[in-house]
């Protein structure tokens, strides 16, 4: 049963990929959706047995690599962390598959799309169930490859090509850091198995590595692993690929942002909690990185006009919350927020897809407006998703995001206070752009063409069913799962997560945090909604004052251009590498040394040599006789010199033999 959870999506992908032309669009969609749905049902059974029954399952399938000290095998671990991730991945993926049946029905390449979607789903369970770093890395690279294929699905669009290449290249930076971290783990622990590494994590706390500076070994490994998480989970510095990934079909965006690729980094940090707990420096770096990411993405999202990009930046911001929750050693709350976030983020993306699908692929919110009367169901779904996103009381997002902020405050450290205040300000911006999206899309007077309004329609039944199920999750999952997963005294994560006793602050955040600290997120959410209402729906004079202010214009330009991250990376890194590639790789090597030492140089040398030799053919006999005499003289001279040298070598060998024999006789007499 456990193996079927992992390999059923692979079966569906293989059938759709190899036999899609015979099954057709409907047959491929039914096959892939059925396989992923059965995987989701089996994940629920595994959750009951493993998480609720408190009985982890470990499977060793077969040896994989065995080379002297390096030994890796195919193995799967099913603990509470794994089964929670499996439910999130398979349940969201099954709904996305069902949604895609209607959304992609008119696309001629629908079987290929369903094949890619299922292979994407397969690699994520492979990542979360692996019992060693090597298997995790296989799933890690697999989701990167599948995301490239899905973002690049409409390959005739230039922007889709550029976005897919950008996602692949930016993630290569993080993947390189992860690979170095795995290599460091093997160097330090002589294994890549999680169980062995985590059991020995406390032993090398005082091990040091000298590379022009003295570095703690565990800290270095954790920083390298963090680089991998920064790339995959779109944290500050390597976050630029995530908004551009919106060039793929909307179901792809929902799957990437809600359940698969971007959650891999958070999962990896939670899985490696026994390592990170013994590196306070790495935890501080994680906290600062997550807090800055949440603030950066929130401030960027308030000025985006693309419907999907606004939701994409909200994903980036929420990932920042998950990362800095890991930085303050609350991995359980981070994973809980990951699970809650999956429901309302998938709901937001699929609701946006319903609008885009009905509006003939229009994504600019400024060209919409007044759609609440035409899309009452979609409007209700997006309203519920937005309220859950901002942490509206008693909805799913409220039970995890507010807890993260309270924990950051009661950490009572500089990094904790930094994360709390930046996270709280990010709540204000999150509320602002969430309500701005609702106002510009559904409530302001319409800016669409009349023909578009007349022919638009609400979500059909196959697209509405996933929205209803996700809406129920966005309303009730947080309330139902809070006490089980992050309640005081729960042992839900006992077999998967590790926290040092000195870092346990959940009880303190529950009882010692001041009431005003608990109310700050709600107050900021209300303020953000009020500002969005006044700026976008009521007060035109505020917009005019904003446009005439020099400072506001510069601030607008700064946020609208994404803090100039793309420009800085292009000017200082991309162009430098392209220039280096042209001047060194192309001109100096390809067209220089390789050509000279390679085919061009060899052919030129032999051609010139042949021309020189051909000039010796003068036609005079005495020239040939002189050449023969010269050659014979050189031949005889060489052999005479060789005979003299060889005789000298032979005489020296004889002398050594005589002396050694005399020495042996003398030794025997003594």
Curated annotation (Swiss-Prot):
Keyword Lyase (UniProt): no
Q: What does the record give as the reaction this protein catalyses?
A: a ubiquinone + NADH + 5 H(+)(in) = a ubiquinol + NAD(+) + 4 H(+)(out)
UniProt keyword annotation of Cytoplasm present: no
A GO biological process held by the record: electron transport coupled proton transport
Domain of life according to the entry: Eukaryota
Q: How does it sit in the membrane?
A: Multi-pass membrane protein
Q: What class of enzyme is it?
A: translocase
The compartments listed are: Mitochondrion inner membrane
EC nos:
7.1.1.2
For this record, the Gene Ontology CC terms, alphabetical, are: mitochondrial inner membrane; plastid
> Known Pfam families for this protein?
NADH5_C, Proton_antipo_M, Proton_antipo_N
Q: Name one GO molecular function term.
A: NADH dehydrogenase (ubiquinone) activity
User: Which keywords annotate this record?
Assistant: Electron transport, Membrane, Mitochondrion, Mitochondrion inner membrane, NAD, Respiratory chain, Translocase, Transmembrane, Transmembrane helix, Transport, Ubiquinone
Assembly, per entry: Complex I is composed of about 30 different subunits.
Function in brief: Core subunit of the mitochondrial membrane respiratory chain NADH dehydrogenase (Complex I) that is believed to belong to the minimal assembly required for catalysis. Complex I functions in the transfer of electrons from NADH to the respiratory chain. The immediate electron acceptor for the enzyme is believed to be ubiquinone.
> Which family does this protein fall into?
Belongs to the complex I subunit 5 family.
Q: Which PANTHER family match?
A: NADH-UBIQUINONE OXIDOREDUCTASE CHAIN 5
Q: What is this protein called?
A: NADH-ubiquinone oxidoreductase chain 5
**Gene source species:** Oenothera berteroana
Which taxonomic lineage is given here? Eukaryota, Viridiplantae, Streptophyta, Embryophyta, Tracheophyta
């Amino acid at each position: 049963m456990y193996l079927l959870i992992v390999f059923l999506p692979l079966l569906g992908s293989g059938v759709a990929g190899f036999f899609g032309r015979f099954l057709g669009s409907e047959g491929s969609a039914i096959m892939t959706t059925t396989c992923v749905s059965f995987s989701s049902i089996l994940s629920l059974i595994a959750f009951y047995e493993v998480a609720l029954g408190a009985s982890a399952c470990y499977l060793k399938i077969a040896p994989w690599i065995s080379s002297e000290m390096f030994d890796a095998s195919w193995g799967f671990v099913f603990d509470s962390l794994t089964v929670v991730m499996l439910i999130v991945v398979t349940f969201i993926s099954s709904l996305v598959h069902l949604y895609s049946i209607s959304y992609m029905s008119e696309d001629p390449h629908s079987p290929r799309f369903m094949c890619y979607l299922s292979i994407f789903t397969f690699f994520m369970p492979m990542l979360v169930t692996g019992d060693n770093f090597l298997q995790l890395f296989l799933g890690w690279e697999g989701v990167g490859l599948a995301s490239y294929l899905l973002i690049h699905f409409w390959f005739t669009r230039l922007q889709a090509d550029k976005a897919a290449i950008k996602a692949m290249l930016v993630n290569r930076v993080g993947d390189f850091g992860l690979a170095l971290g795995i290599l460091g783990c093997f160097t330090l622990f002589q294994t890549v198995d999680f169980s062995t590494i985590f059991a020995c994590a406390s032993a090398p706390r005082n091990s040091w590595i000298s590379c022009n500076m003295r570095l703690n070994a565990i800290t270095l490994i954790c920083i390298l692993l963090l680089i991998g998480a920064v790339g995959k989970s779109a944290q500050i510095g390597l976050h630029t690929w995530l908004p551009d990934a919106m060039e793929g079909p909307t179901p792809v965006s929902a799957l990437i942002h809600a359940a698969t690729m971007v959650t891999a980094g958070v999962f990896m940090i939670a899985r490696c909690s026994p390592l990170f707990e013994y590196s306070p420096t790495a935890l501080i770096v994680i906290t600062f990185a997550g807090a800055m990411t949440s603030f950066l993405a929130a401030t960027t999202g308030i000025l985006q006009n693309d419907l999907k990009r606004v939701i994409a930046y909200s994903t980036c911001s929420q990932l920042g919350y998950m990362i800095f929750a890991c930085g303050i050693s609350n991995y359980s709350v981070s994973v809980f927020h990951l699970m809650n976030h999956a429901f309302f983020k998938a709901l937001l993306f699929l609701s946006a897809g319903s609008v885009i699908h009905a509006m003939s692929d229009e994504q600019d919110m400024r060209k919409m407006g007044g759609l609440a009367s035409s899309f009452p169901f979609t409007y209700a779904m997006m309203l519920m998703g937005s309220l859950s996103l901002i942490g509206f009381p008693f909805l799913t997002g409220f039970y995890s995001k507010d807890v993260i902020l309270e924990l950051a405050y009661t950490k009572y450290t500089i990094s904790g206070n930094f994360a709390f205040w930046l996270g709280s300000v990010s709540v204000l911006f999150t509320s602002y752009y969430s309500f701005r999206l609702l106002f510009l899309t559904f409530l302001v007077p319409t800016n669409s063409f009349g023909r578009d309004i007349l022919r638009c329609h609400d979500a059909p039944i196959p697209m509405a069913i996933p929205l209803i199920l996700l809406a129920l999750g966005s309303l009730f999952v947080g309330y139902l799962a809070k006490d089980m997963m992050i309640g005081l005294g729960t042992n839900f994560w006992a077999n998967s997560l590790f926290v040092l006793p000195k870092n346990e602050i959940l009880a303190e955040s529950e009882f010692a945090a001041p009431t005003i600290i608990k109310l700050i997120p709600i107050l900021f959410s209300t303020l953000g909604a009020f500002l969005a209402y006044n700026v976008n729906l009521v007060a035109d004079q505020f917009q005019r004052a904003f446009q005439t202010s020099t400072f506001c214009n510069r601030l607008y330009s700064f946020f609208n251009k994404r803090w100039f991250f793309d420009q800085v990376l292009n000017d200082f890194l991309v162009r430098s590498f392209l220039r280096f590639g042209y001047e060194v790789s192309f001109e100096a090597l390809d067209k220089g040394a390789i050509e000279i030492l390679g085919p061009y140089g060899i052919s030129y040398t032999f051609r010139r040599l042949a021309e020189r030799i051909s000039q010796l053919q003068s036609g005079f006999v005495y020239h040939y006789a002189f050449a023969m005499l010269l050659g014979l003289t050189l031949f005889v001279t060489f052999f005479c010199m060789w005979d003299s040298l060889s005789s000298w070598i032979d005489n020296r060998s004889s002398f050594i033999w005589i002396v050694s024999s005399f020495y042996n006789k003398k030794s025997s007499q003594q």
